[in-house]
């Protein structure tokens, strides 16, 4: 990566655009989907790079800059709640120097020579929540959302025992928004995951994801079953002042019935900030819940008001982040996992070690090249890190502790499946080798088959509830389900199902009913469910609309496999279809066993024709962007409606955009549309235009 100083303006603009898109995608995964894919440290590095570029090229700051945005927009399944006072985030500090500079900035701004009093509070790693009380009674609760508009989770919050339905005492303001963190302790998290695993359900990667997923359930009864906890630490809108300092406010929150972090303390000056950080870092492993830093706040509220805010964060507070926790352990073995498409992934099996309050027993090694780079071997003592307290990874080997009989790891040349088929290294179209090694056995490989079946029943494919990894593996090992079509013959095994442990009349009946409900399926889901490489959800939808019927699709794929020029040209002409998709489709349908599997499956189903996009509507051929909160339909419904009417839906506004449909909470996209002179419609105007 080039240094900021060496970048041209064009290079900086290009990188800022990429960073904005990348950070926005990670914000959605973290705040809305509760499923982050990178570590906190990696995310912070992206933001720091963005900030450095904007500092060097301030004229390139865009409306959608991550430095001007908080969190992610609310999910459509929750009603919008506008916060009385925005829920802002804090700037981060990563070193003593950063924290000292924060103290110096505060003193410069306030023109003080005296030491400033601060509160130092543990930064809880959970889901931020704002709870509104009127006349002492809980009336509404919302997630952070994008900082201005959050998600209504009132019914779910009412099920959390540590959140009072009525404030204690009497000295509370008439209206107040209490802010805090919903979280799960380590013991509760372990129990929740153990119960989920026993029931064959998906487990959570960490307590933060579990807390967020539990709070954002559609059914409050599910939330009520989760042992969620809550720490209060701040407030938003308040009808009358109730404290003169942050410390006094924390004591008031306790008096009103909330739990506050017992580790919080009041400190003086820069020395106090350093001492509080060191003490909390030492206490961290013993707390029983996750914290990822220390929050410093100017204690005196009058000074907080004077300091005010800059961009998306207050001047009076900062979050001093902990480095990712590390631990030493022994690599006992390297196992090879085989994915749905045959990719071999090495997994390190470790002597159990506690990192960040979680017992870690394995870590991904990614690929053969990574093993070679680390020169990691069985028996090595390694330094392990739960990166961002999310994904365990091996940082390095401690060579001086390596056993004398150690030998370099030899990546397998045959698949670990019973067939022992050859492993081949993937190459690009130009012939260059990639890091991926694949089993050449395809569906003959049982490991690929079980992962293919898991993809087939997944939510975005056939969405068969009750068929998780545990159940599918058990049915596969018994020989009942070897291919997708076998799922629809499972009713023939009803007696055998009832004889299985934990499979009573109700659970068997529900499972078979769920399977029957998926005998009728849309062509797009059918195509996606086949699990063909490079054919994801969007591509499957494009292909379904392009071919219209299952018969046309299957006939065309046979011809593509035979390299029929007209069939290949027809596929290539579809929007977003390129060479990788054509090659993958040809390879898949060129295998007799794949073709037999597809025909067997199609014989069990009623595959609905895809609805052809219309060409004679007011929006046919136009590019539409939906932004803000939609009140009469979900975002997915709006997208599907627009595409049925022949429009193309985009996630960003550009010169190619024809229409922007803006609801409450529309932000930078609306401003960009105005600057570019793009037609802007309300939701009602859009529905009137399309005749709905």
UniProtKB/Swiss-Prot annotation:
Residues 614-692 form the BRCT domain. Zn(2+) binds at residues 415, 417, 439, 445. GO terms for biological process: DNA repair; DNA replication. SMART domains: BRCT (SM00292), LIGANc (SM00532). NAD(+) binds at residues 40-44, 89-90, 121, 144, 181, 297, 321. The keyword Heme does not apply. It holds the Pfam family HHH_2. Keywords: DNA damage, DNA repair, DNA replication, Ligase, Magnesium, Manganese, Metal-binding, NAD, Zinc. The active site is at residue 123. InterPro entries: BRCT_dom (IPR001357), BRCT_dom_sf (IPR036420), DisA/LigA_HHH (IPR041663), DNA_ligase (IPR001679), DNA_ligase_AS (IPR018239), DNA_ligase_CS (IPR033136), DNAligase_adenylation (IPR013839), DNAligase_N (IPR013840). It catalyses: NAD(+) + (deoxyribonucleotide)n-3'-hydroxyl + 5'-phospho-(deoxyribonucleotide)m = (deoxyribonucleotide)n+m + AMP + beta-nicotinamide D-nucleotide. Its cofactor is Mg(2+); Mn(2+). One of its GO terms (cellular component) is cytosol. GO terms for molecular function: DNA ligase (NAD+) activity; metal ion binding. Gene3D superfamilies: 5' to 3' exonuclease, C-terminal subdomain, BRCT domain, DNA ligase/mRNA capping enzyme, Helix hairpin bin, Nucleic acid-binding proteins. Its EC number is 6.5.1.2. It comes from the Bacteria. HAMAP family: DNA_ligase_A. DNA ligase that catalyzes the formation of phosphodiester linkages between 5'-phosphoryl and 3'-hydroxyl groups in double-stranded DNA using NAD as a coenzyme and as the energy source for the reaction. It is essential for DNA replication and repair of damaged DNA. Belongs to the NAD-dependent DNA ligase family. LigA subfamily. This is DNA ligase. It comes from Phenylobacterium zucineum (strain HLK1).
